Amino acid sequence: MQYIVVTGGVISGLGKGTITSSIGHILKDSGIKVSAVKIDPYINYDAGTMNPYQHGEVFVLDDGGEVDLDLGNYERFMNINLSRDNNITTGKVYLEVIQKERHGDYLGKTVQIIPHITDEIKRRIREVARTSGADVVLIEVGGTVGDIESMPFLEALRQLKREEQNVVFAHVTLVPEIGPTMEQKTKPTQHSVKALREIGIQPDIIFARSKQKLTEETKSRISLFTDVPVEGIISVSDVENVYLLPQMMVNEGLITRLSKLLNMNIEYRDSWTSYAENIRHPRDRVKVAIVGKYVDLHDAYISHKEAFSHVTGNTGIAVDIMWIDSEKVKNDQSVLSEADAILIPGGFGYRGVEGKIAATRYAMENGVPFLGICLGFQVAVIAVARYVLGLDGANSTEFDEKTKYPVVDILPEQRGVKDMGGTMRLGSKKVVIKKGTLAHRIYGADVIYERHRHRYEVNPDYIDMIEKAGFKFSATDEEGIRMEILERPGDESFIATQYHSEFKSRPLDPSKVHLHLVEQALIFKHRRMGENHEGYATAASSQGQ
């Protein structure tokens, strides 16, 4: 068992998560079993109640864990499934230690940061290593070196290396380029490594973020002041797509350095060759409008972005995302006029819902390919009730408790639930698909397992009415009680799901409903242009299998 710890310095947002994921991908593609841990120094127990504007998307795992979006990157890059235990927060650590103290586990001792907090951190890391059976566990430490919140975690990791000797430290820093000559400045990296060394950690690898590739002179200067060999200075310059990063790091000599540090024979097979080629040189493009309320922060919908990137890598059809604020759509649907497809993602709260309903109506009435996810599924049901069934004012009780037509209502088991954190219908659930439906053709299966995150469902009292109006609920939960997929028979371009298919999308196995949406968008685009490309998307689909 070996550990690779990835820390960050100078500023946040340098891409530690993507670099950690890329290291994991390289090792996984070399036949090495990997797992990953994200350390988040915030006091929240998990990411479940966080505002997407502050923290980005809340990623949902198979076991129902609501975690940092970096775990989504780990799963996608390494093609592994993680659990809530792979996300360690200050809140989890302190709560466990306090509960042990209340239980009397410390036998009256004074409970302190060292050793009790640090011991709990190490215990959690070792438990992930044990249960995963991984050869290498990657550990990303959130924040930057010097942050007061991360100090106990860095101390625990220093102790981990002292106790086990099988820990590699990698540090991500910024090398800014200043002035008319764009001179690469190493001083921020020098000071960042100095801060790390002051707490007893000497990095073995430095990932230097910059706009342009580091010069050999810059690498030598960083090496001189940090005691990291030149071959351990890895230049990480900007790339057009994050899935091109692993090959860049390989070209920089990362495998040679890791092989020496881990004492492993690393033979990278690069399973993404054709995938990367499709990303670099797409053969066609479509515009997909994502209509949401957090569109100013694209990371709030990062799994949708990545799912579309996966479609591009498998089909060569690039997706240009139009980020549309749902509040603007309510009174002006013209903002959707250039879209080849519309996606309504998940969300909570009343703000922007009427705009999402308007966007759904626009798609239905203009034949624009449509995909609704979670709240988007519920919004589709509301739109059908209002504009097809004529139930004026139909709504979800989430937004209007006194609506005359509550076509979407709270789950029975959610009634009376007071706590917000970790109490929704969460995680992987069995979905049973009806034969002879669009959903069955898309998935090619009778049963699938998808991840959920919701408190509300289609009101059973309105199911027959909606189906008699020309729509069909083509999938349900295992008991046949909860509706999971809505489609319109005879219309290949309209589908909505209660589950979050984006959370299970992988580079070589893209979300099937996102893939279908892009196929339909391509047909719509060329039909609108007056061209006959009926067979084009089918060919693209076969390439994506």
UniProtKB/Swiss-Prot annotation:
Binding site for Mg(2+): D70, E140
Catalytic reactions on record: UTP + L-glutamine + ATP + H2O = CTP + L-glutamate + ADP + phosphate + 2 H(+); L-glutamine + H2O = L-glutamate + NH4(+); UTP + NH4(+) + ATP = CTP + ADP + phosphate + 2 H(+)
Pathway: Pyrimidine metabolism; CTP biosynthesis via de novo pathway; CTP from UDP: step 2/2
Keyword RNA-binding attributed: no
Organism for this UniProt entry: Thermoplasma acidophilum (strain ATCC 25905 / DSM 1728 / JCM 9062 / NBRC 15155 / AMRC-C165)
Enzyme Commission number(s) from the entry: 6.3.4.2
Protein name (record): CTP synthase
Keywords carried by this UniProt record: ATP-binding, Glutamine amidotransferase, Ligase, Magnesium, Metal-binding, Nucleotide-binding, Pyrimidine biosynthesis
Disulfide bonds: none
Annotated ranges, domain Glutamine amidotransferase type-1: 294-527
